[in-house]
């Protein structure tokens, strides 16, 4: 009873259809024979690669070349690179619950490997699950992942379940879960809807001028709130099953029948309460629950709101061909379509197909990615890394880079959204998304990094095809120029639309800084460096606007510097990441260690954090606590590369500490050229860590190559 099944990993294949990644399990021997496993498949799955040792690197540039030789073998046929984008432990539950309540068959191989992944990720000390894979156990993670395992057939008396249930009960049971968990359990029928704080669709009927109107919110929270509000308003619950009845007994510390659900709407365990509800949100929830909904809410208004929300959901689906923004709103949109259109409708069938792209298989099992991948993002960075290392004209890497350029060519978004203004979407013509063109959301730094990658190959390297004509480059720049906020900084998906005071209405509880867009030093820096590079080759295009944009952006970067000289990074770990971007930005504006106090302070901050072994060590906890915290396992290859790139970019004069960091990175390289996985690299919303496993190749290659070009005599 205690041992779980395992699939035959030699039968898994990852299919890349021009950036659309799906995993397939081949039961049929003939199918497995005719579709052989690739080296990339084996790498993702943790299978032996049996690659020969490379010649021992005798210089940093040799080490960069060895790393690139290994990483080039992982390039996928369309020209991009793939990887898991995991870490958050609340994503799989949304996918699995959506499958269950929409009568979507779950392939046996999927069920087996999801169970294996969750078992592998259970906290080895207390048996629970956290917000993310490296976080402390929480009611959010434990209640939802316990539920997933039970839905997939794990017995309640399995030792893992017994331990997890014991922890959950010590934390107060599922009534102490945050809002999102209570919502999912209500959809499933494990909780009563009375325990879920209001998610009124009427908010979408507010005039655009209202300061709290949802169009002003950050795109991820508004696209999650959108289907949530429709489902909440319908109070829809899936059909009751034996497993649901069992979960009602298992997830709570009191008899299910005796629970006064409304009295527990605001209950939350201290482990989960990262962003406590404000007095304003509590007041709004009380008024909605006790006055508006029972006494004042006209059914006609609710219907009108539901109809408008339904149309907005359809626009989101249409503008992404059902790929949707990410792996939280995608499953929710599918549930809406199932309730509204029926299980056999085109909308549900297409959602089922596209949800496959959120899934990934690694050596531990099957997980859900944070989006449908990081394809454009990683590919753009890799191109720039090879260029910066001086290897773009090396014949052995040119075919790889041509393929990568062709991928970015095909992935550029060529048109704005249908009904762009109606569905509150930002301009996107000429943009690149984080993952692929289908997903369709331009992001300021994704556009910038892809644009830089295209320009360095088409304008600065010899012998590359001119795939993007000038007008397409101009389209990207035109879109970039829409991202600057009045502060001079740039946000992510769109300029800031609302006040930071909207955080007082943050209902998620487990995340911070999610209600509106913010100025991000790394996004601002990416845009500015892209515009500087663009202006080098097209100096007359929108010259004055670009110069003004750059100056205002540089002023923002300087203001964003913290008293200790660092910059906070919101999208990766953390101060090393943010400081790398900021220093590269200042260098693009002509500032170096010699002539800029801001640069000197940034370098001094980084050098103050260097460890005895030459490396840098930073934990995701830096992002949570907004102060530099070292990783408990010591120096990290990725953060060391960030720091080296930063100080090299601004001509830090003392080569000795940089050389020590370079030697540390070289010492971690395996004989086949790879670097092994270390601590989690990414973060979002201050509190949730997420993986960027290709960073351990891209940034060390960039750091080593950059150092090797600048100091070719040092080994």
UniProtKB/Swiss-Prot annotation:
Q: Name one GO cellular component term.
A: lipid droplet
Q: What is its EC number?
A: 5.4.99.7
Please name the NCBIfam families in this protein's record: squalene_cyclas
- List, alphabetically, the Pfam families matched: SQHop_cyclase_C (PF13243), SQHop_cyclase_N (PF13249)
Q: What else is known?
A: In Aspergillus, the biosynthesis pathway of the sterol precursors leading to the prevalent sterol ergosterol differs from yeast. The ring system of lanosterol in S.cerevisiae is firstly demethylised in three enzymatic steps leading to the intermediate zymosterol and secondly a methyl group is added to zymosterol by the sterol 24-C-methyltransferase to form fecosterol. In Aspergillus, lanosterol is firstly transmethylated by the sterol 24-C-methyltransferase leading to the intermediate eburicol and secondly demethylated in three steps to form fecosterol.
Q: How does it sit in the membrane?
A: Peripheral membrane protein
GO BP, sorted A to Z? ergosterol biosynthetic process; triterpenoid biosynthetic process
Q: Which Gene3D superfamilies match?
A: 1.50.10.20, 6.20.120.20
Q: Which domain of life is it from?
A: Eukaryota
- The segments carrying the PFTB repeats are 111-153, 550-590, 599-640
Name any one GO molecular function: lanosterol synthase activity
Which keywords describe this protein according to UniProt? Endoplasmic reticulum, Isomerase, Lipid biosynthesis, Lipid droplet, Lipid metabolism, Membrane, Repeat, Steroid biosynthesis, Steroid metabolism, Sterol biosynthesis, Sterol metabolism
Where is it located? Lipid droplet; Endoplasmic reticulum membrane
Free-text function comment from the UniProt entry: Lanosterol synthase; part of the third module of ergosterol biosynthesis pathway that includes the late steps of the pathway. ERG7A and ERG7B catalyze the cyclization of (S)-2,3 oxidosqualene to lanosterol, a reaction that forms the sterol core. The third module or late pathway involves the ergosterol synthesis itself through consecutive reactions that mainly occur in the endoplasmic reticulum (ER) membrane. Firstly, the squalene synthase erg9 catalyzes the condensation of 2 farnesyl pyrophosphate moieties to form squalene, which is the precursor of all steroids.
Q: Which family does it belong to?
A: Belongs to the terpene cyclase/mutase family.
Gene name tied to this protein: erg7B
Disulfide connectivity?
none
Record-linked PROSITE patterns: TERPENE_SYNTHASES (PS01074)
Cite the annotated pathway: Steroid metabolism; ergosterol biosynthesis
Q: Which reaction does it catalyse?
A: (S)-2,3-epoxysqualene = lanosterol
Catalytic residues? 445 (proton donor)
Q: What class of enzyme is it?
A: isomerase
Put simply, this protein is called Lanosterol synthase erg7B
Say if the entry is tagged with keyword Isomerase: yes
């Amino acid at each position: 009873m205690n041992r779980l099944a395992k699939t035959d990993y030699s039968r898994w294949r990852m299919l890349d259809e021009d950036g659309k990644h799906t995993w397939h399990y081949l039961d049929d021997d003939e199918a497995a024979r005719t579709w052989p496993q690739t080296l990339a498949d084996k790498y993702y799955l943790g299978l032996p690669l049996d690659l020969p040792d490379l010649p021992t690197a005798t210089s940093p540039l040799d080490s960069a070349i060895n790393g690139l030789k290994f990483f080039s073998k992982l390039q996928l046929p369309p020209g991009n690179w793939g990887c898991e984008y995991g870490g958050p432990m609340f994503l799989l539950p949304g996918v699995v619950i959506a499958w269950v309540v929409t009568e979507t068959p779950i392939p046996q191989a999927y069920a087996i490997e999801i169970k294996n992944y969750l078992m592998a990720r259970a906290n080895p000390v207390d048996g629970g699950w956290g917000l993310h894979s490296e976080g402390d156990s929480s009611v959010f993670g434990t209640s939802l992942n316990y539920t997933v395992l039970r839905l997939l057939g794990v017995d309640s008396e399995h030792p893992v379940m017994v331990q997890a249930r014991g922890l959950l009960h010590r934390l107060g049971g599922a009534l102490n879960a945050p809002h999102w968990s209570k919502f999912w359990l209500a959809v499933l029928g494990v909780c009563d809807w009375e325990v879920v704080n209001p998610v009124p669709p009427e908010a979408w009927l507010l005039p655009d001028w209202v300061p709290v109107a949802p169009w002003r919110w950050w795109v991820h929270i508004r696209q999650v709130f959108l289907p949530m509000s429709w489902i909440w308003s319908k109070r829809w619950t899936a059909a009751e099953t034996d497993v649901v009845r069992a979960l009602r007994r298992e997830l709570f510390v009191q008899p299910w029948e005796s629970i006064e659900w409304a009295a527990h709407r605001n209950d939350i365990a201290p482990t989960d309460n990262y962003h406590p509800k404000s007095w304003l949100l509590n007041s709004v929830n009380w008024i909605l629950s006790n006055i508006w909904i029972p006494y004042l809410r006209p059914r006609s208004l609710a219907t009108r709101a539901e109809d408008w929300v339904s149309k907005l959901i359809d626009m989101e689906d249409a503008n992404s061909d059902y790929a949707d923004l990410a792996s939280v709103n995608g499953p929710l949109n599918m549930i809406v379509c199932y309730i509204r259109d029926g299980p056999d409708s085109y909308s549900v069938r297409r959602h089922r197909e596209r949800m496959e792209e959120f899934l990934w298989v690694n050596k531990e099992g099957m997980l859900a990615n944070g989006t449908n991948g990081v394809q454009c993002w990683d590919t753009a960075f890799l191109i720039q890394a090879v260029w910066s290392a001086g290897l773009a004209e090396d014949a052995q890497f040119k075919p790889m880079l041509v393929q990568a350029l062709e991928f970015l060519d095909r992935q550029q978004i060529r048109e704005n959204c249908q009904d762009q203004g109606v569905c509150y979407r930002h301009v996107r013509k000429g943009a690149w998304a984080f993952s692929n063109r289908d997903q369709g959301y331009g992001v300021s730094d994704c556009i910038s990094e892809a644009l830089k990658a295209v320009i360095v190959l088409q304008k600065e390297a010899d012998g590359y095809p001119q795939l993007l004509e000038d007008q397409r480059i101009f389209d990207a720049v035109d879109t970039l120029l829409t991202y600057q906020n009045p502060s001079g900084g740039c946000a992510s998906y769109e300029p800031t639309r609302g006040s930071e005071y909207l955080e007082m209405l943050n209902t998620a509880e487990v995340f911070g800084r999610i209600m509106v867009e913010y100025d991000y030093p790394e996004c601002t820096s990416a845009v500015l460096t892209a515009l500087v590079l663009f202006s080098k080759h097209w100096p007359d295009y929108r010259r004055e606007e670009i110069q003004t944009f750059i100056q205002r952006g540089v002023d923002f970067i300087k203001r964003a510097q913290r008293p200790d000289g660092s910059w906070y990074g919101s999208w990766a770990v953390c101060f090393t990441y943010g400081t790398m971007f900021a220093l590269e930005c200042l260098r693009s504006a002509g500032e170096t260690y010699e002539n800029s106090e801001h640069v000197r302070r940034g370098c001094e901050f980084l050098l103050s954090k260097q460890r005895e072994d030459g490396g840098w060590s930073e934990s995701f906890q830096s992002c949570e606590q907004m102060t530099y915290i070292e990783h408990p396992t010591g120096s990290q290859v990725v953060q060391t590369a960030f720091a080296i790139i930063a100080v090299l970019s601004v001509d830090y004069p003392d080569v000795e500490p940089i050389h020590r960091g370079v030697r540390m990175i070289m010492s971690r390289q395996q004989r086949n050229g790879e670097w092994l996985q270390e601590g989690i690299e990414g973060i979002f919303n201050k509190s949730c860590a997420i993986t960027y496993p290709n960073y351990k190749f891209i940034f060390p290659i960039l750091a080593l190559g950059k150092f090797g070009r600048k100091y070719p005599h040092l080994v």
